[in-house]
Amino acid sequence: VLDSDGFVPFLDGLPALPQVAVSVVGYMGDQAENEQDLTQASLVLRSNFEGPAGMLALLANRFEARGSGTLVGVSSVAGDRGRATNYVYGSAKAGFTAFLSGLRNRLAKKGVHVVTVLPGFVNTAMTEGLDLPAKLTAEPEEVGTAVLKAVQKGRNVIYVRGIWRLVMAIIRNIPEAIFKKLSI
């Protein structure tokens, strides 16, 4: 995902252009390290925004020329509002979510559908060691099933677990003066 020079050769080497392409990238790094080390912060930004957006942009052009296809971008609820505990990762995911929204708008009348997936916490290597609430945490297979259903039903934006829609609506609507006092 970081080797953008390899994107076009990779796509050119495919035996056929797929009907569905899914971008699933998640690299959070350590927020404290991201704050002090520009190289580390750049890695988080490039991994979660620049690389996935670049690949999907190239695929979008090819799907548009063909007149069909579905692009799926797995973003994050962390992009719904910047928080002190993960704002480098969250800002990259916010950018990716906005990119997917704009791409969806651009391709809406071109036969190409774009799906944004907001899974919330997922039991993966990235979240290993974190104390996550079970009701808010999905298994990778659950995310995969949700992606498949979203593609089949032509959804635009999905939260893998519906509770995240409510949680993030509340978090987005907390006034900034109060939000700054919270430790989330």
Feature roles, as predicted:
Residues S76:
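Residue(s) in the substrate-gating loop at a strand-loop-helix junction
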Residues V1-D5:
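Rossmann-fold cofactor-recognition segment
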Residues R81-Y87:
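Active-site loop immediately N-terminal to the catalytic Tyr-X3-Lys motif
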